């Protein structure tokens, strides 16, 4: 329970806190828990024992800095030292040894693996324990089942069949009598009957033969093994059989873990100690008792809701890293055992460190983690498109991944919003497409209880004691606790304590919405944004938008590109500052002092007599090819305080998030250029660099050794290439810094040696070999060339040389991209569109004061989409622009009074009209609209038009990366049709529906060309080029295209032969021809 002393007001927690807390738990507890499980390695023949101790382990500071790890493609990790003991005969050695490196989380909440920023997503899984459900079969008979889920995700089912016999289904195929299972777990029949509530039901179904099978534990284990492993014949009881059963069944299906034990005790009213984390016979019997009670009506039909958050748990970064550490220690154990055997063969005296030092052993830890980060679906490349994306990525929760659901098989119920999500998982923010509802985002106040894995939400406790003290206590409720509280919603969301609460308020109780007296309320919400994620909380007037459009908006804000000159929004929600702060893109002063000097690379600060150098990020490439850049914001000689902003990051202004630009928009049709979500823009946005962004692309090349053993060479001396293409290379063959490069230019010159074959020798070469014995070698040119669409300025070149023959060269090229036709823009209300035309500013519609409009949106995009928030935003933005004001508006302002949003907008427009003495800003006949003029003719438009200042973002979906054309290129090997996709230089596919469209117009010859010459007719497509160049007639071939041949071959594989026959008109002779 948390309490704030002053007024009980709660502050928003740090958005990256969840990742940091998880990693700290792994370092402080997870490492110790796994080291405690490490067994003592003994070799009885030679009286040797090796042991690791959980206490006193140490992590050294990383040997390299973050920047260098990224620069040199290394892993940012820390060396782990553990206390070890080696008993060798009578000699006991204790030593602190290094067992490898562990990746370390940086200040962004991410890891650097091989130079790439990666982040671990929280996974939401079904909690281990037991779950009951009852359903009717096709005959209307009730079927009750209980499912036991282990900590590893293994499932076992208890069920009662039509003959009222109780079975345990340990896998999909095998089912085993509950008596056999209990006996195999160590209970005899007398113990079973003494520990159940319905012994007569247990006695009713076993016959004499079955009773014989459970006479002893050994017989029960044999019976269980035969049925579980589907083995026939006479088996003999042995220790190896027990071990196999232990490994295959009991470890996978019966380990409940700490969380599972708590859930099992709570569900079945047991009092088994928490440290007993395995399934016991007592659990099985209690679970069967409950099932019998459900089936025969003596119990309550209380089905478990599998989608309720109380039945889910979060696997955070701590759990996943701890699992990998346990896996690495298991591998270390095997490696040490091998080393011990090797030591005795060589007859050398071992020490604890020499057992772990061999190269393969010492890198086990880091290779395990690198494999995990490279292959695990929830360890993702960190999304660095903009500061919002960096903040949001670590707060994602996903039902996907190992042990979870899949996009193709998940049901609608598992994707749906559940009442228990309130204040924990955002009801809006999820992905679109196949994974809708399976990936979500944590609400801004939610926190994870790392011990039990539940998501908690804060509330104000309304108790008599708190009312007397005039204090508010903040309580964090887990999903299973808030069912017992009356939680006030609606008007009680107000932040102002002076507002008198109504007598009757809407409330939530046990997943139902009620209206009850204020005196009966237990807790209330603490913040209007409490239910939303960061993305949803940045949408002003979200309550006026349809939820589908709010979802699109929260996704599209994460795709916004940082612009060259950022601008903060006129209308916001107030959460922009904390989002920018927690993204760590700005530089914050860690101590007070005085600025000595500042430039684009560093800031020098004098504090307590010391000079501190603070490095800045200058034009660094992000994972999404956007430009990360920090600009100093403090002049020389200025005194600064702790926490003050020293340098702004990309897409931040004054410490606030600034993803887009405030531009003048009009909602009106214009010559069809804004049909179907197209957007018409003014050329001012291009010429004044309003939507100009910088992008950095990385190109790399590596030298290797050929199969003949000769090394590749980086050089400027490349024969057969024009001098023009090599103009930017320095004497080493690498492009110069600051060069302007165009498509096709050589960035790094490289030659690969090739030994010429005997047949390719020319006469002179043969003579040289005969006289001097010289081998003639030819070199193939394998240089790094700039691909299509890559033109720009070289801003950085990295030469990484690990050994003389292994050289990697990376070239970074900066591109300046203005907005152009085909780029995608969007507002913060899901109103997205593609630029269709860029008009000269004199042709754009203009206002009554002569200001030309910047963007023209289609008004038909508003009513059907029901995202009316954009109308409020644009009108209030216009008022704010004229009054030089910024607004920060909390959602659901209708809780104060009806039509609060509309009243606010109209009052501000009226104030702006009065102060600027412009009556057109607020016209009472059509408030918010204005008569505007056609820029081409000067005539006013017939209808008044809605105008305003909207905050519009430029998205990362840009035409430069999408547009593609092909004349010739690669073909698929089987069908001989052009390959698919821009990356492969692919062609356009004319599919079935496109063929129908052409058939509808009767264009037979065009269709013939498309399906043969331009596609997969091998001979015809070679001849058509010749015919086109020389102006000859295109030949008409009778043989079929390649795809038809593929069809014939596929029919042959089904034993169907396809032939055609030519029948003579004269004598009706049949000439058979093969297809």
UniProtKB/Swiss-Prot annotation:
Q: Which reaction does it catalyse?
A: RNA(n) + a ribonucleoside 5'-triphosphate = RNA(n+1) + diphosphate
Cross-referenced PROSITE patterns: RNA_POL_BETA
| Entry EC no(s) | 2.7.7.6
Q: Is the Nucleotidyltransferase keyword given for this protein?
A: yes
What domain of life? Eukaryota
Q: What class of enzyme is it?
A: transferase
Where is this protein localized, as stated in its record? Plastid, Chloroplast
* GO-annotated cellular components: chloroplast; DNA-directed RNA polymerase complex; mitochondrion
Q: Please give the Gene Ontology molecular function terms for this protein.
A: DNA binding; DNA-directed RNA polymerase activity; ribonucleoside binding
Q: What keyword terms does UniProt attach to this protein?
A: Chloroplast, DNA-directed RNA polymerase, Nucleotidyltransferase, Plastid, Transcription, Transferase
Q: What broad class describes the main subcellular location of this protein?
A: plastid
Q: List, alphabetically, the Pfam families matched.
A: RNA_pol_Rpb2_2, RNA_pol_Rpb2_3, RNA_pol_Rpb2_6, RNA_pol_Rpb2_7
GO terms under biological process: DNA-templated transcription
Q: Which PANTHER family match?
A: DNA-DIRECTED RNA POLYMERASE I SUBUNIT 2
Protein family membership: Belongs to the RNA polymerase beta chain family.
Summarize the subunit comment.
In plastids the minimal PEP RNA polymerase catalytic core is composed of four subunits: alpha, beta, beta', and beta''. When a (nuclear-encoded) sigma factor is associated with the core the holoenzyme is formed, which can initiate transcription.
State the NCBIfam families in the record.
PRK00405.1
This chain's function reads:
DNA-dependent RNA polymerase catalyzes the transcription of DNA into RNA using the four ribonucleoside triphosphates as substrates.
Q: What is this protein called?
A: DNA-directed RNA polymerase subunit beta
Protein species of origin? Saccharum officinarum (Sugarcane)
The gene for this chain is: rpoB
